[in-house]
Amino acid sequence: NVLENINDNLAIFTSRPDRNLKMLLGIWENLIIPKNKDLKLLVTNNSYDYNYKSIIKRKLSDQRNLIKDLQSSRMAIIPGHRAELYCLAAEEAKELCVPIVTLGIGSLAERVEHEKSGLIAKNDLQFSEYIFELFNNNDLWKSIRNNLVLQRGKNTWKKVAEELINQTDNY
């Protein structure tokens, strides 16, 4: 069930480490940890060197564990990357009804609707503020979560492929 067993202090990053994980770790270290050491960030296994109890490396395993990790997270934090054409991590989070906080880089501006499926920040400071907002504002979190529940299952591969083709036709 997508509505149970959520850790209210846990966020997750499931994209590839080269998709601005280093940027996210810097924001977490400088803007999140100093304000609340109880918050946890579950990240894709990577080679970056950091020593914070609040940043946890996910072991890459099977789909069931990824789904479990996503479902137990209050939000997905996905900055985005200029090379992304689609961002499967965002779609996975949305289908599992996990609100997203993003900088809207690359395709994330298209994958996330502000205050509908997540929050789109304009800069690093606003990004960190939106992370805190989703951790602390239950009404906003529930509103986005409920919208995601209503949208769940409405994206088919056919619809997504047609949208992608339409976007590429504009280039």
What spans do the regions from the language model cover?
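Short glycine-rich donor-binding/catalytic loop of glycosyltransferases
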Residues: 98, 102-109, 123-124
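Conserved acidic donor-binding segment of nucleotide-sugar-dependent glycosyltransferases
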Residues: 114-125, 133-138
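Short alpha-helical donor nucleotide-sugar binding micro-motif in glycosyltransferases
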Residues: 62, 68-73
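Short glycine/acidic-rich beta->alpha loop that forms part of the nucleotide-sugar donor binding site
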Residues: 84-87, 94, 104-105
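A charged, aromatic-enriched C-terminal amphipathic alpha-helix characteristic of glycosyltransferases
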Residues: 122, 138-170
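Acidic donor-binding loop of glycosyltransferase active sites
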Residues: 71-85, 98
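Conserved catalytic-core segment of nucleotide-activated headgroup transferases in glycan assembly
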Residues: 2-59
